[in-house]
Amino acid sequence: METIIEEYLRFIQIEKGLSSNTIGAYRRDLKKYQDYMTEHHISHIDFIDRQLIQECLGHLIDQGQSAKSIARFISTIRSFHQFAIREKYAAKDPTVLLDSPKYDKKLPDVLNVDEVLALLETPDLNKINGYRDRTMLELLYATGMRVSELIHLELENVNLIMGFVRVFGKGDKERIVPLGDAVIEYLTTYIETIRPQLLKKTVTEVLFLNMHGKPLSRQAIWKMIKQNGVKANIKKTLTPHTLRHSFATHLLENGADLRAVQEMLGHSDISTTQLYTHVSKSQIRKMYNQFHPRA
């Protein structure tokens, strides 16, 4: 089965153009699947049946896997078995009648405007890495881009004169996101003054660099966000996507068009963007008081 898995992973990388992070998630799911089948002495893919898969799912649930993780696991193995049939590696698909568990799609905590401002103002602008961190935080909130997109930004992707950034998202899909005056000011200083000091003797077009002149990792940016969150005394749980969620929520709360927000976020399905249309109770009360004739 290992050979078929590798063929499948090659297929989704080349044919579907999925990101390395997504492929990594597929690989981890299929490794769990293969390990379980090996433990149960399954030597061929056609020996797998629906009952065995359900037992595998029960094993994952016993390990504490969430409903969301189980749903993704089922999606992965379903796609894998469909590939196996299409490529003549298997004669049957044991996932045909398999149901995915339902789970609530919930957003992580969203920061309010005051909390965002507190977070943005935390880095020390008198330090090189502090100015860089402030610029990254400003850019994340100004554009709603993913951290994985931020770390791959190159100089040529930023047009400060026209005021936009070219972002390459999942599957290398390109989108143009406008920039506001505040983030343009920080980017200008960073590119002209701060980045050359970080660059040193390194030759790279990557926009954001660490103190050794190398591209920053996702883990480094996540750590930076969490540390600044603590300094800003923010009690909510911060994740690499917190500013992205806050960006979308604040736009929609202030009347932005859902389709425009979908475009800026790079969502292929508008139902994903609709998750952000939750409005706080205070916002609902404010809208009611403002617009209802008998309020």
From Swiss-Prot:
Q: Might you name a Gene Ontology BP term for this protein?
A: cell division
Which residues participate directly in catalysis?
A: 146, 170, 241, 244, 267, 276 (o-(3'-phospho-dna)-tyrosine intermediate)
Q: Disulphide bridges in this chain?
A: none
Pfam families recorded for this chain?
A: Phage_int_SAM_1 (PF02899), Phage_integrase (PF00589)
InterPro entries in UniProt: CB (IPR044068), DNA_brk_join_enz (IPR011010), Integrase-like_cat_sf (IPR013762), Integrase_catalytic (IPR002104), Integrase_recombinase_N (IPR010998), Integrase_SAM-like_N (IPR004107), Recomb_XerD (IPR011932), Tyrosine_recombinase_XerC/XerD (IPR023009)
Q: What is its main location?
A: cytoplasm
Signal sequence range:
none
Q: Where is the Tyr recombinase domain?
A: 106-289
**GO-annotated cellular components:** cytoplasm
A single GO molecular-function term is:
DNA binding
> Where found, per UniProt?
Cytoplasm
- UniProt KW Cell division keyword: yes
Indicate yes or no for the key word Cell cycle: yes
Specify the Core-binding (CB) domain's residue ranges.
1-85
Family the UniProt entry places it in: Belongs to the 'phage' integrase family. XerD subfamily.
Report the function annotation for this chain.
Answer: Site-specific tyrosine recombinase, which acts by catalyzing the cutting and rejoining of the recombining DNA molecules. The XerC-XerD complex is essential to convert dimers of the bacterial chromosome into monomers to permit their segregation at cell division. It also contributes to the segregational stability of plasmids.
Q: How does it assemble?
A: Forms a cyclic heterotetrameric complex composed of two molecules of XerC and two molecules of XerD.
Put simply, this protein is called: Tyrosine recombinase XerD
- Identify the species of origin: Staphylococcus aureus (strain Mu50 / ATCC 700699)
Taxonomy-wise, where does this protein's organism fall, top ranks first? Bacteria, Bacillati, Bacillota, Bacilli, Bacillales
